[in-house]
Amino acid sequence: MKAIKYLVMAALMLGFSATAFAQEAELNAALEGIKSKAPNAAELAKTAYKKNKKNAEALVKIGRAFLEQKDTANANLFANYANEAGKPKYQYAPAYLLLGDVEASYGTDGGKAAGYYNQAIAFDPTNPEGYKKWALVYRKISPSQAAKKLQDMKANCPGEDIDAAIAHIYMLAGDEKQAYENYAKADINKLDKGNLNEFVRSSYFTGHFDDALRAAEAGLKIEPRNAVFNRLAMFANYELKKYDAAKSYIHKYFNETDSAKFSEYDHFYTALIYQALEDKANMYAEYDKALSLVNDSSMIKRHAILKSVSDSYLKDLAFDNAIKYYQDYLACKPELNSDDQEGLAKIYSKWADNDEARKSELIGKAIEAYRVMGEKYPIQAIYSAYQCATMSNKLDKTGEKGLAKPDYQKVVSLLENKADRDNSENTMLKYSYHYLMSNAFLYGKNKALAKEYANKILAIDPDYAPAQQIKDLK
């Protein structure tokens, strides 16, 4: 009797195994056929359905295979088959995830996709995918609501890093500040390559260079040849004034990274690193590379690079090149302002201080630049005249020639009757009066006029000693 019992059980088990094997074989055939776009893929899927109509998991696999091939009709069909096969019926969370993915990827109704994901959450609140997918869909409507949904996930999915998930939502929404703040709270050791990529970028572009470097170094442990991690490790080290460390990444970035497309910004930053290290040859070479690559769509503009090159030559007292690149800068900057015009005057002034033989010529060019500033930008007319006078003083330090007199007189004419003078205007007026007072007393031999200017100075600054001395003269 026992022998018969065992024979019956063995037969049942063999039958079950054979059925299971057949189901799996039909499923695999369908999956392979869909993936390879076989002509009979639909027929293979139909056969697999007949063999697996009670296997919800298998039916979702077929639906996902169709979704990967952008066959949304069959993806939806098999999602519904899976939902019917689920226990309880129509409460199978993976089926709703699939329906949501179809709508989110190829549909036009984000609300409908979010509805499917909500049903997935309701039927399996311990599966983090529903929360994450709902948040990804809803981020376009309200990133803060999407973040709140992920907070709901925390209670039911304690193993999930919600800080990283929330940060990802904000990054996709273009809110780098919120992305950074949430990544900064996440456990960096649990972040994958994609999260670290977002962490390093959100940190760098919000000015948190310590965290940018930390994220880049963590990413390089996972993928040493990653271009983004090497690039931003180089940039972050520069911003942290770790110039030798920044230099160590120059070779790595340009020679030991995969899929790196080098830009004008890369070469510009590299030039700044070499500049900080006083490596002038490499600095100028990198500036040249940056200028050869820059175009209208570049992150950094041509005029900004030209200005940096000019500043570098000025620092090196290479005045010819400083002027050349500064004039190129002025020629290509779209909207010039008075500071740009004054920059030209300042280069000529510094050059004059370092070239006695050409001093008169160069001061003349500085004065000309200031006069142009006053003409182009009338709001700077007073300041322009004052600076022209200051330049003239470099050629007439005692004031005997009176070179600065016309410009100081212009300052006085523009300011002395101005009712609402600010502190800087009072300062310019006071020193203009001082020059005219000294000129009248020392070279004009006109004590009365000198005293007149002295009284005007004391009305501005009662404690100004030189004016007090002139006033007290008998």
Regions inferred by a protein language model and the residue ranges of each:
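Alpha-solenoid helical repeat scaffolds
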Residues: 2-8, 12-443, 469-474
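Eukaryotic acidic, Ser/Thr-rich intrinsically disordered low-complexity regions
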Residues: 457-474
